[in-house]
């Protein structure tokens, strides 16, 4: 699994519905979301409250509750978490305030907290303690992770804010760490194709989805061979 430097986005490898009350998507950047004048209505995903990833746990540093997590929890939790992060990112990209380091870069750092919680556990399980159901989940999620990543890195409005900050970086009064974060973030967006034409971005999306699926299958084959020869 490969993590981008500046925010929790997964771009590589990666199911128990219960009748409890669902948890509604909540934004970790609610202050930004409230200021967004262009919020686009979408169907709200829900996550059953019986899913261990639906809420914070009592363990230190939100350590995974492996005794409660089952294979069937991952896909709904991951889909919910991606929708949650997309809502957070859209709020940042669509806000009317001029871009600042705080309302753009710092806000981006705060997105996808649930996604990271679920994805790290999922990645560890698929790499070290997998089974047939996890493999199916991994194959299902791989192109969705790729699409989620592209929705962020190919977001024109989001990149415009980052690009504006980058071009004015000498006047922002940033410390060395903040400056480095801005530079790396800008570089990551460029490498992901943020300045490509709309047509080329569509080609990139298709290639990324294919690479993600192939990489997932390749990783599964390697793990299978290692296990069979152990």
Question: PLM features: residue spans?
Answer:
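Zn2+-dependent metallopeptidase catalytic domains
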Residues: 19-230
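Bacterial N-terminal signal peptides that target proteins for export
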Residues: 1-7
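C-terminal motif of bacterial Sec signal peptides marking the signal peptidase cleavage site
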Residues: 14-17
């Amino acid at each position: 699994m490969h993590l981008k430097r500046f925010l929790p986005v997964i771009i590589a490898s990666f199911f128990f519905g219960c009748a409890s009350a669902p948890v509604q998507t909540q934004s970790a950047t609610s202050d930004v979301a409230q200021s967004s004048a262009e919020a686009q209505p979408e169907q709200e995903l829900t996550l059953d409250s019986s899913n261990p990833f639906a809420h914070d746990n009592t363990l230190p540093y939100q350590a995974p509750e492996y005794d409660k997590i089952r294979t069937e929890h991952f896909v709904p939790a991951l889909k919910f978490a991606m929708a949650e992060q997309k809502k957070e990112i859209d709020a940042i990209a669509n806000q009317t305030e001029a871009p600042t380091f705080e309302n753009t870069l710092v806000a981006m750092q705060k997105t996808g907290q649930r996604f990271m919680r679920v994805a790290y556990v999922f990645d560890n399980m698929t790499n070290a303690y997998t089974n047939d159901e996890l493999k199916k989940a991994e194959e299902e999620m791989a192109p969705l992770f790729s699409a989620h990543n592209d929705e962020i890195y190919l977001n024109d409005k989001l990149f415009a804010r980052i690009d504006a900050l980058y071009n004015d970086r000498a006047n922002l009064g940033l410390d060395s760490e903040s400056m480095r974060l801005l530079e790396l973030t800008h570089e990551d967006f460029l490498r992901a194709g943020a300045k490509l034409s709309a047509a080329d971005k569509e080609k990139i999306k298709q290639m990324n989805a294919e690479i993600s699926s192939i990489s997932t299958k390749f990783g599964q084959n390697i793990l299978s061979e290692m296990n069979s020869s152990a």
